[in-house]
Structure formats: structure tokens, C-alpha cells
Amino acid sequence: MATLKEKLMTPVAAASAVPSSKITVVGVGQVGMACAVSILGKGLCDELALVDVLEDKLKGEMMDLQHGSLFLQTHKIVADKDYAVTANSKIVVVTAGVRQQEGESRLNLVQRNVGVFKGIIPQIVKYSPNCTILVVSNPVDILTYVTWKLSGLPKHRVIGSGCNLDTARFRYLMAERLGIHPTSCHGWILGEHGDSSVAVWSGVNVAGVSLQELNPAMGTDKDSENWKEVHKQVVESAYEVIRLKGYTNWAIGLSVAELCETMLKNLCRVHSVSTLVKGTYGIENDVFLSLPCVLSASGLTSVINQKLKDDEVAQLKKSADTLWSIQKDLKDM
């Protein structure tokens, strides 16, 4: 007796069992779900997998997204605490970890999160050995280093979301003061995602016009217009949002979706993301910091050799020293 489906359809060829643009999000907290929704909203993947240890919440989030499938271009959304569900992922976004508390420095989080990552990273590599891992959990630069060490993957396939969001915040705040759209204001935040990030004032421009040439004091304490306040706002913005709503999620979710889009579509766009910087700008230790990097289908394929002023290089080295002072004491690696 033929089933309804057999009466409805005549098979012609076997459907592909392997997804071509699968993305996994590890961790279904506020940040993880913002990443998932932003990725789905862009229609980037043919399959989305979610992983978490909280089974009820995980199943609930999966079902909630599945029920919206009619409005999406991703027809397959799966979830499980077993990492087998992540098999054949092109990109794995890691958002899991203990959450930052109000007023807590990102660096204070690190040792608490190392233990969490030991249960995550080897499982990712087991089921998706050819994936690129995008680390979002804070403190992101050190946890990207931890991921690189635990995964055994080449450095171009372990990337931290880094200062991509800091750069977006910077461009937004600069553009607000200038009365233009953020896409028309070009500037970069490098170094550590967080307290010791570096604003590259020498490179800020609008339509190729250097703002520091118009105002040589820009970014210094001698600036009567106090543009340095913009970078201070960038550094403090996450803490402010956490104070107001308890966490940050939407901006980082949108930032992560853009990074995934650049890699999946092989767009070769330049992003400020965390990468191994040993050997650049006189940095001697195995630390991950954000530099302008070209992302493609292969992962991180090039680093832009940005011309920095001496004080900017000094700040970058200070960022590296800040991170290394924590990293060198990490245990169970």
C-alpha cells in the first residue's frame, strides 16, 4: 500500500545528504540566539545546528525557530546536546561560557571558561575537522588562543570576533557626531576586544580625507573637541548596555552574521578580527589580537599591514602584554 508521500511524488534522484553551507552555534544563551537569528535573517546557511547542555531550553529554541521556517531560507534547523548534530559544519560559532557580570573585566572570566572549552572544542573538531571556528565568548582574544591550542587547527581557521563590533561601535559614534552614515566613516579599532583596545586615529577618514590631518590633535588629550571621548565610549559601551539591560546580544549577533557571510560567500572583505599576532609590530608572544584581516571561504587569508604611528604600536604592544600576563598562567591547556 503506497503512502501519501509516495502517491504525491515520483523520485527522480537521491537528495544530497551533506549540507553545503552548514553553520553551528554552540550556546543558546542571549548571544548565541542573537547570532542564530541574525544568520537566519541573512539566509546564509542551508542547515543551522544548535548545541547546549541545557536540553529543555535547547529544544525550545529549536522549535521556536523551526516554527518560523516559512519566513526563512534555511529549511533545516536541528539541535542536540550531542555534538554529532554539528557534523559537516562549514563554520562553528562558539558563544558558550560563563556570562560576564556587571562591572566584571573580561579578563577575569578567562580561567572559568577554559574548563568549559575543554568540553567543546575537541568535539567540534571531531565532527567538523574542516570547519572554521569563530570564537565569540569573552574574553574573546584569550579564548581564541585557548581554542587554537585545544583544536590543533591551523591559525587561519581559528578566528575571534575580536574588534569587529568595537570597530562598528566606533564608526557609528564617529558618524553620529559628523552627521553621516557609519558606512561612510572609515576607522579601525585594533588590539584587545575590550579595555585596552586601540583606536587608530591616524587612519580615520571620510571619503579619503584624513580627519587627523584636519585636526592634528584628534585622539589626544590636547584636542579641544575631545574626539578621544568617542573611543572611551566604545570601551565603556558594553558595560553600559549590561548595566541597562543585563547583557549585550543584538549588536554582536549582527556582527557575527556579517563575519559568517564574508566567509561563506567568499567575499574577501576586511574585518577587525582576532588572529595570532606573534611576529607583527614587535610582538613576541603567542597572543591573539585584532588586526584588519581578509576573510574568505578558506578562513582568514591575509592580514593588512596597516601603517601605525609609534604611539599606536606602543598601545598594541601594551594590549599584547595585558593578554599575555593572563595567558601565561593558564592551566590545563
UniProtKB/Swiss-Prot annotation:
InterPro entries: L-lactate/malate_DH (IPR001557), L-lactate_DH (IPR011304), L-lactate_DH_AS (IPR018177), Lactate/malate_DH_C (IPR022383), Lactate/malate_DH_N (IPR001236), Lactate_DH/Glyco_Ohase_4_C (IPR015955), NAD(P)-bd_dom_sf (IPR036291). Its EC number is 1.1.1.27. Gene3D superfamilies: Lactate dehydrogenase/glycoside hydrolase, family 4, C-terminal (3.90.110.10), NAD(P)-binding Rossmann-like Domain (3.40.50.720). GO terms for cellular component: cytoplasm. It holds the Pfam family Ldh_1_N. Its main location: cytoplasm. Keywords: Cytoplasm, Eye lens protein, NAD, Oxidoreductase. It is an enzyme of class 1 (oxidoreductase). One of its GO terms (biological process) is lactate metabolic process. It is found in: Cytoplasm. It comes from the Eukaryota. NAD(+) binds at residues 29-57, 99, 138. Substrate binds at residues 106, 138, 169, 248. The active site is at residue 193. Belongs to the LDH/MDH superfamily. LDH family. Interconverts simultaneously and stereospecifically pyruvate and lactate with concomitant interconversion of NADH and NAD(+). NCBIfam families: L-LDH-NAD. This is L-lactate dehydrogenase B chain. It comes from Anas platyrhynchos (Mallard).
